UniProtKB/Swiss-Prot annotation:
Function: Regulates glucokinase (gck) by forming an inactive complex with this enzyme. The affinity of gckr for gck is modulated by fructose metabolites: gckr with bound fructose 6-phosphate has increased affinity for gck, while gckr with bound fructose 1-phosphate has strongly decreased affinity for gck and does not inhibit gck activity.
The protein, known as: Glucokinase regulatory protein
Pfam families: GKRP-like_C, GKRP_SIS_2, GKRP_SIS_N
PROSITE patterns, sorted: GCKR (PS01272), SIS (PS51464)
Ranges where the record places region Essential for interaction with GCK: 462-464
Assembly behavior: Interacts (fructose 6-phosphate bound form) with gck.
Source organism of the structure: Xenopus laevis (African clawed frog)
Amino acid sequence: MRGTRKYQHVIETPDPGKWELAGYEESLPISEKSNPMTRELDKADPSQLVQLLRDCDAEIFQEEDENLIHYHRLYSESVLKTMGDVAKRVQEVLKNPDDSLVVLSGCGTSGRLALLLANSFNGLLKGLHKTPCYCYIMSGGDRSIVTSQESSEDNPQLGAQELEKVCEGKKNVLFIGISCGLSAPFIAGQLDFCMRHLDVYLPVLVGFNPVSMARNERIEGWHSSFRQVAERLQTLHDSQKGFILNPAVGPEGVSGSSRMKGGSATKILLETLLLVAHKAESNVPVTEKCLLEILRTYERAHKVTYSQSKKIAALMKQTATSLQKKGHLYILGWGTLGLVGIMDAVECVPTYQADWRDVRGFITGGYHSIENKEGDLSSLGPQFSISHEDFVKNVLPSVSETDTVLLIFTLDDDLNQIEKLVALVKEKTSNIQVICHATAGQYLPNSLKKTIPSIIGLTWPILFLEYEGAFIQKFQRELSTKWILDTVTSGAYTLRGKIFRNFMVDFKINNSKLFHRATSVLQRLTGQSHQRCTEVLLQSIYGEQTLSEQIRNTTIAGHVEAAASQDKVLPVAIVSLLRSCTIQDSRSRINSSLSIRSAIESSMNVPGRKRGAEDSESR
Ligand code: F1P
């Protein structure tokens, strides 16, 4: 442990990683760097995978190290101070709920978290018979709750329009824009809109890169880059007319997968800040101590969660086996834990090119429990059926021994109903697993215990804190569930050969960020120039060896649209570059390989191949 640590930590956070050293993958922002800890993620077995991802998650709580690059961390004084400053401004909104609003906005996982958080704090207010004053925006609208709609993320104008719409008639709006990578144009558009109307709006940006690492290419069809917007926002900091909350939490265990640490850190940071603001309303002043007290409960949650590592590894192994046999993972959650399950399932589609049926989430009460703005979306198609009734009616009849069913609940939920569902599922598959949250002193009834072969049991301490105490426990359970599911699904897809080293190599290129990520992964794995990598990526997207002038002159948005109808775009480009073979040859090689990973691995060892940058740097 380092001597510089200021706080007594609940968990043992790892020592600073090599990624903090100057020059480490210098051209990449932290959120896109490859984590040195997980370089051999693809070779790990389930227990090692859990351990590696556990250590990556622990980096969220690591402190700033003055001997290294001066990255601000969650516990840095400047970050705690900004959290306190924003909390005080939230308090002002809470005092005048009629013409004020707190808007939380994000894309993908960040948008789903905006929904979860807005509902939590509206629930907190309603419980006190106060007016709800939170609202959420997610790019792509409510359909993005259950499906991935990554392309709307690229539209800054749309972001601004949506914001204007939800704030109509309000005199005081605190806007919280979440973009883990400081990258989403949708959020840039909203921040820019706020900065043009500072009489009404207070813009707050949440993400996990320094401003100097925010995305720097000019947004297509717009006037600025994300970085320029963030820099403008930074200048408002001293006058308290705008804030940026961007502690470094380290690179993701799976490079670029911001749903993981980025999502967890968003939840930790914002829930802490908002809870303190609500406490402060009851005349408790906003202090660093209040913030630290809550942050520590999340550290404790990390410890409690990963005390179940063995069982998490078993669930991961079971899930990987199901997926390998063309089976499924069905996640059935109660209350907000159901939403956490849906969040995790949805992201498997863009991150691993999974079919939407492979991993699915269901929630008790369906849309009614989610409390989304657009109400019941189930008429939009089978993908949008998310209630337990939908599962029983439409999915259960075809469940078989190859499928895994995971139930997630707390001991305060309807245990009779759970027991009945367990019995129904057991008629179809013996692969039934449970994540069960209890408060100290509560026990799972024997009747349930006997029927479920494998239980991940998490017991949370009783928190003797006024009304908010119950919310802290809810937040801990949600985060703990998120950590387990992130680890299980990322690990299962790693075991299925969807990861090479720690790079996602088979993701959907459905927005500009992902287009750039694809080129960057190509460069890192092959050591070839940016220009050459872009060329081969385009060959793979269009399935043409010779690129026409028209293709070369197409915008990135156009390439993204073309990529939408193709599968395995990135793996085909990687193998084609490594083997100097045609796109067609590469595709047939991949199609006849055991996995994407094995196709890349065998291409790495082709005689005479030029060594890649990654090879020489660290292997
Ligand atoms: C937004 C996001 C992620 C998702 C995927 C694509 O990222 O939709 O939530 O996991 O990586 O991007 P960000 O704007 O929060 O960085």
